[in-house]
Amino acid sequence: MGDELDHIRKRLKDEGEKTAAFFEALSLEDWDRQIYTAGSGWRIGDVLAHFISAERAYQVYLQDILQGGTGAPDNLDIDQFNEAEVATMSGTPAELLETYRQVRQDTLKFTANLKDEDLSRPANHPWFDDKELGWYLKLLYRHNTMHRMDIRKSFKSGAPLPHTDEHRTGRNIDPQN
């Protein structure tokens, strides 16, 4: 088995554990803190719900890619999808954490059947356009890491953040601007 596929599996496992530990360490008061100002003003629980819904969607897209499809539909409005999906999810912090762990386990099971050559299969992403299946898998752990950084930044500043990449990269991703 190739080094890249092993690396991706390890990062998915390790970053999944870090994400779960991060959310487990939060107090109940923290769970009600608003993190983003855009859209519905996601709170901590909404961010974890977003991880769950996004990863579930990626699992469908990844399977589609393996079957010769392109992944995410070209016309997917990612912001609308995220808002709609998060709005349908509810649960206690413990329930959301358990669901997150199960979804990550499902992703790890998916990777168990991959071959090295699968990583280069062409794939579409609604925000990043044409990529490859391996890139999608890496995005699963990078995505969560970026949001955890946002949560820490919001906690440190004591204020919610705009949902942009400006505080990280200088690139504004807010669809309203």
What do these predicted regions represent?
Residues 1-18:
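Extreme N-terminal tail/first-helix region
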Residues 80-121, 135-138:
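Acidic/histidine-rich alpha-helical segments that form the ligand environment
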Residues 13, 17, 21-25, 29-36:
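An N-terminal domain-cap segment
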Residues 32-79, 122-177:
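Short, contiguous alpha-helical
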Residues 16-24, 55-59, 63, 101-115, ...:
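Structural signal for well-ordered, non-membrane alpha-helices
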Residues 25-31, 112-120, 156-160:
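Surface-exposed helix-capping loop/turn segments at secondary-structure junctions
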